[in-house]
């Protein structure tokens, strides 16, 4: 279903990269133009990461079969999901593991009885990912500190805290600050995790 759109996107990006290099587009840009270009290119990267994260989530789901021979990893000759991702993405093990953790946080659950799609662990984080607001760094910055409070803190409280931090990622926080970077998101999430789990 995605094969043709992704192929078209690859061709377009390839043309842009080659053209930008030949035209020395970055060198010729003013500082304000260059800043806008960096921000726009980073947003494109987050959209690409969103597609990759969802794909990794599905690879993980297909590799969770208790029967080893029926796992996607086994079908493709790999020991586990990390090894398969290293092969497919050319990433190192640490980056492959980060992709898996991000996918776990935003992957919608599937009902075992009806096959219906259910909410992800952090719905607002998933929505921010789909909107190109956060990529792998942002997802993990928000979700990792909050996930560490489970099971001592109710899921609803973790989600509410994530919603507040996501507002900061979108630049919609109460202080009117611009969209927060991943490091600031991590600090916000850690603060909420400490507040929710004071005995943890």
Predicted feature residues:
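Conserved C-terminal region and hinge/linker of Rieske [2Fe-2S] proteins, especially
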Residues: 1-200
């Amino acid at each position: 279903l995605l094969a043709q759109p992704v192929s078209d996107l690859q061709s377009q990006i390839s043309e842009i990269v080659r053209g930008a290099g030949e035209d020395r587009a970055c060198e010729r840009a003013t500082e304000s133009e260059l800043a806008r270009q960096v921000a726009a290119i980073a947003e494109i990267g987050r959209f690409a990461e969103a597609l990759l994260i969802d794909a990794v989530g599905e690879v993980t789901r297909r590799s969770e079969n208790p029967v080893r021979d029926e796992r996607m990893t086994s079908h493709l000759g790999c020991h586990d999901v990390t090894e398969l991702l290293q092969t497919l993405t050319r990433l190192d093990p640490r980056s492959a593991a980060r992709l898996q953790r991000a996918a776990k946080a935003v992957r919608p659950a599937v009902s075992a009885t009806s096959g219906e799609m259910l909410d992800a662990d952090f719905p607002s984080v998933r929505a921010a990912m789909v909107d190109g607001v956060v990529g792998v760094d942002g997802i993990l910055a928000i979700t990792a500190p909050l996930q560490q409070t489970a099971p001592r803190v109710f899921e609803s409280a973790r989600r509410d805290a994530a919603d507040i931090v996501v507002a900061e990622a979108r630049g919609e926080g109460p202080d009117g600050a611009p969209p927060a970077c991943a490091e600031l998101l991590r600090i916000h999430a850690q603060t909420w995790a400490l507040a929710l789990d004071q005995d943890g």
